[in-house]
Amino acid sequence: MSDPRYQIDVSVVTRFLADQSQPEQNRFAFAYTITVKNNGLVPAKLLSRHWVITDGDGQVEEVRGAGVVGQQPLIDIGASHTYSSGTVMTSKVGTMQGSYQMKATDGKLFDAIIAPFRLAVPGALH
């Protein structure tokens, strides 16, 4: 069981960006909006991200970096941080998953898990 002091929940909304995609060149652009909510008992700062992006052909790309969209937000108890970003894939369908490294104000380092979510061109899945 995880420690209730360090409870970060991540929710994701995705969308296909037809105007930024070039299907004839196997270029499919997607945007995602992520909400990181602190349901724990201690404020926590989002230090870094780790993404595992898998396209429909099984190709895997890992992305690591500081913060999210240039920020390392401190998320208070009961508060949330929402941001939008995007990715380009070479297939109509893929998944993303990963984690955020967090640092609570009491000094504890912990990971907030980002459950797998699907990116798909509308109509690509039956």
Curated annotation (Swiss-Prot):
HAMAP family given in the database record: ApaG
One of the GO biological process terms: error-free translesion synthesis
Pfam families in UniProt: DUF525
Gene of this entry: apaG
Superkingdom assignment: Bacteria
Domain (ApaG) ranges: 2-126
Name of the protein in question: Protein ApaG
